[in-house]
């Protein structure tokens, strides 16, 4: 039997994402919501998402140490002068997590991660786990990843990037058909299903960079929202006896 941990990442990155994630939870597929503390829309996330029933969904901190888009930037909650290895000369996070290789100070990164934990908790979210935005530690800085695993342990949280992920699904064309093919490749096991739902909205126009053209994020994230809100998606998973679980159940 296959068990999925469906996770909606980037809550707090935009109001369009916050509204879409709430809709996806109502659709019955999303069971975990990862919150980004640095972007301004985290305040909106508290209004839109905080009252969701934790018997149905759990919240985690999406530890955010980079700002990947050219059209919108964010920086640390900590005073940038206290975490110089994390910021550029404008006080923003670096764009690509690979830029932190050989540069990042793990103590500074932990100070910022703790500040992010404090912020989302102060907004009223009960956290069950943490994970890493764009795999900053798990993919690029192993010593940071180990430090975040230890931080999670100290805080009584599950580190949600230690399980194998479901490989990404192409979000163009017939997304439901692609989704079914991908799930069909895994008759059993436990996988994290990373998602980034959002409404197609002008708010996402700044989400572009040298690798991601303007408009792509809005189109793809809206396609993912529609997949996750489609009643056929949940029904098909149930027919295959795919279990959908929260990290809080671990």
PLM regions and their residue ranges:
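DG-centered beta-turn motif at the end of beta-strands
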Residues: 8-11
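Short histidine/acidic/glycine/proline-rich micro-motifs that form metal-
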Residues: 134-139
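Terminal accessory/targeting
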Residues: 2-5, 15-125, 129, 141-250
